[in-house]
């Protein structure tokens, strides 16, 4: 194994002066043509401003950590996420990458313990930070969408749906306060799947009728979890309860039609299906955006709100033109 396989880069500007990162930080060097990693700051020590200034003086933009310490680093970054987002030295692509990695890390914890108030609090802070990034960076849409994972896991799908849904909602002109409420609902839209047997969730073949009936229960199971969590309002539950409802009344769990479905539920439905189609599954390759939209338009006719779906196509088209 190459020594580089044990390390991963982290952006220097995500390390704040006079803080304890919690994991060892290394500098990459070349000795006799070979890569070496030299310990620069012990994870239990405070990294002083002089050390950071020294690195900046030598044009060093990346430090390195052991891959096994990624979770520690992401927890550290999470605690200063809003500062990172507002730091003009960090470009939007790097900000998007940091936010996305932190988001996936949080949702892994959420799905392992969905009733934890601490994890919910972390997730809500993440939504606020993501909205902050989207609002303060005009090029956020292109940067963020380009780093979304193409591999389907329930936790990464939840992050994709939340981020893409927030970008689309900003495009629609939805205000900050509503974005916050909507983003929380989108992030937790599949939380009920934590209560479904893993063999059903991870099954590679088509589900039988009994299994499909069981997995449809994730909607109400998710709503039940969140109604018992403090600080999750009723409006945030619309994406959770209604992301499988269809405007033609053929969805579940309540076969709602048209305007009986809340706008946030309609948005969640579009984004949920689009992300599912454009991510790689064990039983299906990821579809290209145009192909996914074509399937949604022609093979799922009547499922989505016509006006919102048209605007979603325009939203994606606007992004691809930049």
Model feature map: region roles:
Residues 101-322:
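Histidine- and acidic-residue-rich, metal-dependent catalytic cores
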């Amino acid at each position: 194994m190459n020594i580089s396989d044990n390390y991963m880069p982290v952006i220097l500007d995500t390390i704040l002066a006079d803080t304890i990162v919690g994991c060892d930080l290394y500098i990459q060097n070349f000795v006799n043509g070979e890569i070496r990693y030299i310990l620069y700051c012990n994870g239990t020590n405070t990294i002083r401003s002089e050390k950071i200034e020294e690195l900046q003086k030598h044009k060093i933009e990346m430090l390195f950590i052991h891959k096994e310490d990624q979770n520690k680093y992401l927890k550290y970054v999470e605690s200063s996420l809003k500062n990172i987002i507002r730091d003009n030295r960090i470009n939007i692509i790097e900000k998007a990458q940091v936010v996305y990695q932190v988001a996936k890390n949080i949702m892994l914890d959420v799905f392992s313990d969905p009733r934890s108030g601490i994890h919910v609090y972390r997730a809500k802070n993440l939504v606020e930070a993501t909205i902050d990034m989207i609002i303060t960076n005009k090029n956020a849409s292109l940067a963020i969408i380009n780093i979304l994972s193409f591999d389907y896991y329930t936790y990464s799908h939840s992050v994709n749906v939340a981020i893409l849904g927030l970008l689309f909602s900003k495009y629609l002109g939805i205000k900050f306060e509503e974005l916050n409420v909507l983003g929380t609902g989108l992030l937790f839209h599949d939380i009920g799947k934590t209560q479904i047997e893993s063999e059903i969730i991870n099954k590679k073949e088509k589900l039988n009728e009994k299994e499909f009936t069981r997995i449809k229960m994730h909607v109400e199971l998710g709503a039940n979890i969140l109604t018992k969590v403090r600080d999750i309002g009723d409006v945030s539950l619309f994406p959770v309860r209604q992301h499988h409802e269809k405007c033609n009344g053929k969805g579940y769990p309540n076969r709602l039609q048209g305007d009986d479905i809340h706008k946030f539920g309609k948005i969640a439905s579009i984004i949920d299906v689009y992300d599912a189609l454009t991510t790689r599954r064990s039983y299906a390759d990821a579809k290209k955006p145009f192909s996914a939209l074509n399937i949604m338009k022609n093979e799922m006719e009547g499922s989505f709100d016509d006006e919102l779906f048209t605007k979603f196509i325009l939203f994606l088209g606007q992004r691809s033109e930049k």
